[in-house]
C-alpha cells in the first residue's frame, strides 16, 4: 500500500491541471475521491493555493472527517478551498454502537459541532451530507427509533442531506430476535 504523503501532487501541477481543464473544457466541478481529504492541513492548503493561483471558480465535493476538522482547526481552510459539498461519515447516534465501530467522538458532540459549522460558518454556501447505519452491533429497536427521532429534529440535525443504511447482513436467529431489525408492521 501507499505511505501517507507519497502520492500527493505539488501545487504547481494542480494549478496547471485546473487551468487546462477550465480553459479547454470548462471544467470547474470536481469530486475529490480521497476518503480522508483533511487528514493533513497540507492538502487543504495546497488546494486553497491552487484555487487562488489558477483563478478557476472551483466547486469541490469532498469526504472529510469531522473529528479532524475540529481537532486541526480546519474550517477556514475548508472555506478557502472552493468546497461546496462535504460528506461526513458520522455513522451512528448510538454512543455504544459508535464505540463498537471505532468512533472515538461522542455522536451528540459531533452533531453539536455540525450545527456550529452550519449556523456560524457554512450557512447555505456549503452543503453537508452524512450517512447513518442502522443495525450496528449495539443497536436496538429503541435506539434506532431514538436516532430517527433526533434526525427529524431540525434544531438537532442541521445536515442538508441524511442517508440511512440498514444492515441486514446479520442474518442469524439471535440477531433477528434481538429487536434491532424492525419486523413487518413496526
Predicted regions and their residues:
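Flexible glycine/acidic-rich beta-alpha junction loops that bind and position SAM and/or redox cofactors
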Residues: 41-42, 96-101, 132-142, 157-185
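Radical SAM [4Fe-4S] cluster-binding motif and immediate context
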Residues: 1-124, 134, 149
Amino acid at each position: 500500500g501507499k505511505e501517507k504523503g507519497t502520492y500527493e501532487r505539488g501545487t504547481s501541477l494542480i494549478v496547471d491541471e485546473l487551468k487546462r481543464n477550465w480553459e479547454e473544457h470548462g471544467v470547474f466541478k470536481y469530486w475529490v475521491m480521497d476518503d480522508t481529504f483533511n487528514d493533513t492541513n497540507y492538502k487543504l492548503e495546497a488546494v486553497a493555493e491552487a484555487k487562488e493561483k489558477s483563478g478557476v471558480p472551483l466547486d469541490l465535493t469532498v469526504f472529510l472527517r469531522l473529528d479532524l476538522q475540529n481537532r486541526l482547526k480546519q474550517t477556514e481552510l475548508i472555506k478557502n478551498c472552493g468546497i461546496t459539498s462535504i460528506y461526513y461519515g458520522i455513522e451512528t447516534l448510538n454512543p455504544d454502537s459508535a464505540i463498537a465501530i471505532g468512533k472515538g467522538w461522542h455522536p451528540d458532540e459531533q452533531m453539536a459541532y455540525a450545527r456550529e459549522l452550519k449556523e456560524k460558518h457554512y450557512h447555505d454556501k456549503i452543503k453537508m451530507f452524512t450517512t447513518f447505519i442502522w443495525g450496528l452491533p449495539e443497536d436496538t429497536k429503541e435506539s434506532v427509533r431514538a436516532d430517527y427521532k433526533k434526525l427529524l429534529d431540525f434544531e438537532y440535525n442541521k445536515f442538508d442531506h441524511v442517508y440511512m443504511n440498514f444492515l441486514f447482513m446479520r442474518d442469524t436467529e439471535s440477531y433477528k430476535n434481538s429487536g434491532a431489525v424492525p419486523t413487518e408492521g413496526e
